[in-house]
């Protein structure tokens, strides 16, 4: 119990140190909106590939929903507000999400590993750049197990995170594909590498926005993985 709270407290401190750099993630920056649009296209491609066509009928929980930006995207894509939910550790981000999202969207505060959510109640559990902020392996595993428990058979975990360490930021660490598979050993993984390395993206987009697309054609320069981790359906 103490270890769980220690890591949750550490995450809070890491995000507080990161707040000063938030301007780098403004959608007014060309590399940022291109990163977001690329991820959206890849996500929609995964939905189509895996038969998730009726978005309005799907129940989705985002772990680490922040200020609600991803949930707003999902609403625009066709998810219904009453079928969306978010969990957020940081009170100020949770308050911002509550002020932004429809009242029908349920939001949970606090440590997600302690969330009292019904097993197999979600079609999708979405997690975006969360595990890279968790530096305790045991805490990572507990969260992954909770997420897997919430997903119904035939559903899955939608995962987006970076895979390599950032030497300039010791508050995060990359989550390689092998580690992701280790966290969800029963999952069937469909992964694709996306997102031009942010330091490169910032430099080239400053010269011209179109250079993001050009440099992103080189797979070795992509630092993130978007994956659908399918939970096997029950035999019929």
Predicted regions, residues:
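A C-terminal cap/extension of S-adenosyl-L-methionine-dependent methyltransferases
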Residues: 178, 192-236
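A short SAM/SAH-binding and catalytic strip from SAM-dependent methyltransferases
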Residues: 124-138
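A short acidic, Gly/Pro-enriched loop at the edge of an enzyme's catalytic core
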Residues: 113-125
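Short alpha-helix
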Residues: 171-187, 191-192
């Amino acid at each position: 119990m103490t270890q769980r709270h220690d890591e949750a407290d550490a995450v809070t401190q890491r995000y507080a140190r990161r707040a000063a750099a938030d301007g780098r993630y403004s959608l007014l920056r060309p590399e940022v909106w291109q990163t977001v649009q690329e991820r959206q296209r890849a996500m929609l491609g995964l939905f189509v590939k895996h038969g998730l066509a009726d978005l309005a009928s799907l129940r989705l929980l985002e772990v680490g929903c922040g200020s609600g930006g991803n949930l707003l995207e999902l609403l625009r894509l066709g998810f219904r507000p009453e079928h969306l939910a978010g969990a957020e550790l940081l009170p100020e981000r949770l308050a911002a999400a509550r002020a932004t999202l429809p009242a029908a969207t349920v939001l949970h505060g606090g440590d997600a590993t302690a969330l009292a959510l019904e097993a197999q109640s979600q079609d999708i559990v979405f997690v975006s750049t969360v595990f890279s902020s968790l530096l305790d392996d045991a805490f990572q595993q507990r969260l992954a197990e909770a997420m897997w428990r919430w997903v119904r058979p035939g559903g899955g975990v939608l995962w987006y995170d970076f895979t390599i360490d950032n030497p300039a930021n010791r508050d995060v660490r990359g989550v390689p594909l092998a580690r992701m598979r280790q966290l969800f050993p029963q999952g069937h993984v469909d992964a694709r590498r996306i997102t031009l390395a942010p330091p490169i993206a910032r430099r080239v987009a400053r010269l011209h926005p179109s250079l993001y697309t050009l440099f992103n054609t080189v797979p070795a320069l992509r630092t993130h993985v978007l994956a659908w981790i399918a939970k096997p359906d029950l035999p019929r």
